[in-house]
Swiss-Prot record:
Compartments where located: Cytoplasm
Subunit record text: Monomer. Binds 30S ribosomal subunits, but not 50S ribosomal subunits or 70S ribosomes.
GO biological process terms held by the UniProt record: maturation of SSU-rRNA
NCBIfam families membership: PRK00521.2-5, rbfA
Keywords: Cytoplasm, Ribosome biogenesis
Protein name (record): Ribosome-binding factor A
Name of the encoding gene: rbfA
Functional summary from the UniProt entry: One of several proteins that assist in the late maturation steps of the functional core of the 30S ribosomal subunit. Associates with free 30S ribosomal subunits (but not with 30S subunits that are part of 70S ribosomes or polysomes). Required for efficient processing of 16S rRNA. May interact with the 5'-terminal helix region of 16S rRNA.
Organism: Rhodopseudomonas palustris (strain BisB5)
């Protein structure tokens, strides 16, 4: 195992979490205020549920989700096109030694939660969840 990798199950450092939250607020504020002049971004409401920082704080992975979950690829492409501008704006709003490189990803937690919920409602799983009436 590398010297810089944490063992599985160990939590994120408080600094990474705090910086990730600051970057998340900055990106969300920029997008909410219409700071990026792009027709795609101006016509979509975009939520930023999470930002994950690399251990050296030089890379920020910004997870985004367009409201309604439509046009995800179009929104990611528009954000990627303006990531230099967004990086500069984040650098102005968040006081860090280095402005983090930004990459955008779709937040798939909602889709995954929906898939699990759907799976739990299947007849086979429902049958397994019912209490046995044979045990008296």
């Amino acid at each position: 195992m590398s010297r810089h990798q944490k063992p599985t199950g160990q939590s994120e450092s408080p600094r990474k979490l705090r910086v990730g939250e600051l970057v998340r607020h900055a990106v969300a504020e920029i997008l909410a205020q219409g700071g990026v002049h792009d027709p795609v971004l101006e016509t979509h409401l975009i939520t930023v549920p999470e930002v994950r920082m690399s251990p050296d704080l030089k890379l920020a992975t910004v997870y985004v989700m367009p409201l309604g979950g439509r046009d995800e690829k179009l929104v990611i492409a528009a954000l990627e096109q303006h990531k230099r501008f967004l990086r500069g704006e984040v650098a102005r709003r968040v006081n860090l030694k280095y402005a983090p490189e930004i990459r955008f990803r779709i937040d798939e937690r909602f889709a995954e939660a929906e898939r699990i919920e759907k799976l739990l409602r299947t007849p086979a799983v429902q049958k397994d969840l019912e209490p046995d009436s044979d045990q008296d």
